[in-house]
Amino acid sequence: MTLTGFRHQPVMLREVLEWLDPKPGGTYVDCTLGGGGHALGVLERIGGRGLLVGIDRDADALAAAAFRLAGYGDGVRLVQADFRELAAVLRRLETGPVQGILYDLGVSSHQLDTASRGFGYQQDAPLDMRMDPGGGVTAADLVNRLPEDELSDLIKAYGEERWSRRIAAFIARERKREPILTTGRLAEVIKEAVPARARRTGPHPARRTFQALRIAVNDELGALKTSLHQAVDLLDAGGRVVVLSYHSLEDRLVKDTFREFAVHCKCPPGLPECRCGVVPRLDILTSRPRVPGEDEIAANPRARSAKLRAARKRADVLKDKGVK
């Protein structure tokens, strides 16, 4: 990889900065640093007295971001980690409460376009899909080892794929002949499994299955839920969390998590007064997700499915806990 050639076009940058609202001298965390496009926008707002913590599992992304953000010196701290380790990372850096946390979920353009990473179905490459190539199961492990019914359930749950049973059956048949070890071969098997009438319109027939495998390999939804819960604890009063998601599973999880922390009462209906003692911790800022404009989609088609949600830590939470 050449650092200057790392492809990164930040999605909805203007909207991210609007809802994150970085303040001079503040501390902000980019949990999915990528090439550093969003981080650069934040750094321009917070100035020399601020701090930007960038987290990413991908060593290539960290190297590219370090190159891009080098001019900000001690105002940038970059860490290779899974964002489910957010609390541990900030504790180690001794940042204290932070004023904003950003997530730009999913796979980056660089990862999709780098054939050797095995995320894409347009090129033939080893069937990998790990965000951190240093360890863990690969997509090939799942495709070749999972029982057919478990593979079908995985594709259905994480890919919302209508033809999951048929795809799993075709995969099980083909792997008996020879292990499926490349993205190209898996894409061909999926294409054969999906009926011709369903292939005539819409995205590539392999898209949903590849999404499902990637989510499973990296435990993306589990990591997101864990990290969002930590983010609520780590935010300062009035601090904001902004999330860009790219498919319905991510967006639903973000929406439900924000609602969980914004609820005023969990008592059963019918009680004359609240007895649960639940205190809302977030104010939801985006009643509906924000989406990219037509001009951005034309310039960057991969932004098409993006949805932005934002929430703010309530100031009265700290007062209720006796924090002055």
Swiss-Prot record:
It catalyses: cytidine(1402) in 16S rRNA + S-adenosyl-L-methionine = N(4)-methylcytidine(1402) in 16S rRNA + S-adenosyl-L-homocysteine + H(+). GO terms for cellular component: cytoplasm. S-adenosyl-L-methionine binds at residues 36-38, 56, 83, 104, 111. It comes from Desulforudis audaxviator (strain MP104C). SUPFAM superfamilies: Putative methyltransferase TM0872, insert domain, S-adenosyl-L-methionine-dependent methyltransferases. GO terms for biological process: rRNA base methylation. Specifically methylates the N4 position of cytidine in position 1402 (C1402) of 16S rRNA. The keyword S-adenosyl-L-methionine applies. Belongs to the methyltransferase superfamily. RsmH family. Keywords: Cytoplasm, Methyltransferase, rRNA processing, S-adenosyl-L-methionine, Transferase. GO terms for molecular function: rRNA (cytosine-N4-)-methyltransferase activity. It is found in: Cytoplasm. The keyword Lyase does not apply. Its main location: cytoplasm. This is Ribosomal RNA small subunit methyltransferase H. It is an enzyme of class 2 (transferase). Its EC number is 2.1.1.199. Pfam families: Methyltransf_5. InterPro entries: RsmH, SAM-dep_MeTrfase_MraW_recog, SAM-dependent_MTases_sf.
